[in-house]
Amino acid sequence: MMKKGKGKNSGLLPNSFKIISSCLKTVSANATNVASSVRSAGASVAASISAAEDDKDQVTWAGFGILELGQHVTRHVLLLGYQNGFQVFDVEDASNFNELVSKRGGPVSFLQMQPLPARSGDHEGFWNSHPLLLVVAGDETNGTGLGHSFSQNGSLARDGSSDSKAGDAINYPTTVRFYSLRSHSYVYVLRFRSSVCMIRCSSRVVAVGLANQIYCVDALTLENKFSVLTYPVPQPVRQGTTRVNVGYGPMAVGPRWLAYASKSSMTMKTGRLSPQTFTSSPSLSPSSSSGGSSFMARYAMESSKQLANGLINLGDMGYKTLSKYCQDMLPDGSTSPASPNAIWKVGGVSGSDAENAGMVAVKDLVSGALVSQFKAHTSPISALCFDPSGTLLVTASVCGNNINVFQIMPSRSHNAPGDLSYEWESSHVHLFKLHRGITSAIVQDICFSQQSQWVAIISSKGTCHIFVLNSSGSDAAFQPCEGEEPTRLPASSLPWWFTQSLSSNQQSLSPPTAVALSVVSRIKYSSFGWLNTVSNATTAATGKVFVPSGAVAAVFHKSVTHDLQLNSRTNALEHILVYTPSGHVVQHELLPSVCTESPENGLRVQKTSHVQVQEDDLRVKVEPIQWWDVCRRSDWLETEERLPKSITEKQYDLETVSNHLTSHEDACLSLDMNSHFSEDKYLKSCSEKPPERSHCYLSNFEVKVTSGMLPVWQNSKISFHVMDSPRDSSSTGGEFEIEKVPAHELEIKQKKLLPVFDHFHSTKATLEDRFSMKCYHTSATGSHQVNGKICQDIINCHSKPGSIESAESSEEGSTKQMENLHDSDHMSNSIKSSLPLYPTVNGIYKEIEKNNANGWMEKPVTAKLSTLKETRITNGFTTPPILTDSVNEQMLSTGKPPMGFGFALHEEHCKAVADPKEEHLKKKLDEVTNVHHLNVNNNNTEKLQGDKMVHGMVSFVGD
């Protein structure tokens, strides 16, 4: 029975293909009319969009980087290379997207931000020029004369000895220029005789990758350190859909290691290295057998040939669509509809070197020893990338179907004492195999999340493939229960991928089998920029703006404004920032799939849409939140946003001080950047060293014109302390006990408070001249001046908390404003006076009548402690206002100022009394006023002489 049934099925299958073929011919005839309608509609839409796209500059390279302003101060930036220059955007804060640099010039093929270099010794190098941007462009004659040139054999040549022609500058970029974002100028140039394919930077080295060689220069001095020969870099024959970037490149630089595509397998001292046999796992699941999958793949390919006649009318797209499902069962490196040979070109490879295709070598940047070497793929390597920790290495081949993730675990060999070597075979573990797709594509960008749990792979087709590195391979992390947040990976002091089998004492055991992971979500590219056709029709009907689609470069970063952050989903798994082919930066939010039960059918949404989930991999939803159009227009001006000098200079000063401090003398830096890029808060403190104290003081100068309560920090019992950053190993988890953090007090150094003098025009005069004052007479016909001597003067006393009010003024005359400068509560005892006030018992000053030289009778002003705003003189003369303090009237009755109050003098109100104490009064005034005089010209006719002391006091703090 089974044989008979099997025979029937074998005969039914070809007949079914014939029926399907005839049906497809009928459908294709009708599809031709539909396709023509779609093409005409697309052409009209493209024509409407092209008008707005014509003024945009052509982008040649795009990527995200990190701008380091200090040891713990970083900002995410977007780097854009154009046919006519480059552009740098600050994308750290969504509310303040800022264009830092926009330069026009020649074509740029690569951009990279250089981290702050690690300083060693007294070498300053180019530290003063940081932050530095590395620009790969053609060799130009207008560059700076400072730089080096590298010959083909790796020797260092003189600057200007490059044989590259002027015409090769556009097609073959051979120059690396170091652009300072601080001075906005090129400070250094590296010239090579072959094209520069890629650049990677760390705090130790700057690695420049050429077609067959890698040069590593010191990150601080930019001097050549070493070079290595590599497998020829595959050159793309044609660009991808986005026509931006040419591939990520087979080179990776971590905090300690350099990974590159090795040209040949190295030999150890114990013998020839035996490479580990690489067997690619099937694409379906780890439990599937490779033999069965290959048989099914061949059978499916033979069956697809029977459909060729029916599919030929549907065009090349239909064939690729059907072949896509057949290729899903093929192992890595098998023939695919789009062969990698049609995308990549690898030149300069001999027969022996071709066997080493896919070999990866890891080199120690400090010792220069080879840490590990293994065969990652059967095809040439096209992309290498380290995670933020520098221990996970992502590898991709020219096929681009599968991406492997390895963990680098150095294992020392003990063959020779004192010899630094590693066991290459046991220094790596294959952790994950990420399946991107079945068609070949160029991997042009790779990015990790901060905790290395998420990884995004961007292909040249404009699609961003998002994976989650889950060691179990299940989807438990994305299926939230109702009313609960999604389960996330637990935090641990050890790496999340660390297991007991990976410990150093068990490395003799076989490594675990690599876990096959599939895409959890995709950000797809549409040729018209829309996310999908249905949503576009909806947005067009509602009048909403379409969302830019696709991806060229990405970074896991949350750049959301405060308003949108309040409305953000609480169950968001991660945020990713993407640069699209249309020139937009889009902020996406990663959300878990919706799993709600329907009361009618009792089924979950995910189960009812199983076909859609299988097609689109919607285990994690990617929703755009906001986007910005950042592509430069042809009419935009160049921009040079200068970084705050306080940031770079203070950072340099702190680094200089910390390098010269002993272990006991430590410096603590706290640099806080707010959303506005030009503002910063800077606090510097030094620890105490018994019995000395570092000369670092906290000073304050405050101008106060009204009275009020003292601030809390002005109290003498208040002190300031600075806590050092915790460096204990127990604080690695993010929490620490604040009581155990060492704190150091900031010294507030004070000096005696001194009065501030307002000199204006000072002249020397006699004592009588200092007490002479000009009076102004106002009449209906005009103003005339009368000289005379004022026979009464009043001394003003000022208390720190009290206010200065004008007790008397004139309706016709103008009043003078006085300022009261205050400091800490220690200034009260700075100045005291023994000058008599001559008050009466009822609190009113004595009125002394005296005939002046002109026969006028002057009646001096009476100053009461009241709220009078003006005082009139009966004889028609006015005097400047007298400023008094709101102290109690007992001060006037006793004739002595209260203790603890400072004062200042206005000598135009000082009273010269002809009594036996006149000589004592002259002596005291000379000591206080220092013989300063005030000259005021009025209508250039006469002069007003007298001393003036401005109300106020200032504290001189620090040394």
Swiss-Prot record:
GO biological process terms on file: autophagy; protein transport; response to starvation
Keyword ATP-binding: no
This protein's record includes keyword Membrane: yes
Subcellular localization: Preautophagosomal structure membrane; Vacuole membrane
Induction (free text): By sucrose and nitrogen starvation.
Keyword tags: Autophagy, Membrane, Protein transport, Repeat, Transport, Vacuole, WD repeat
SMART domains: WD40
Location of region: Disordered: 802-832
Role: The PI(3,5)P2 regulatory complex regulates both the synthesis and turnover of phosphatidylinositol 3,5-bisphosphate (PtdIns(3,5)P2). Required for autophagy.
Full protein name: Autophagy-related protein 18g
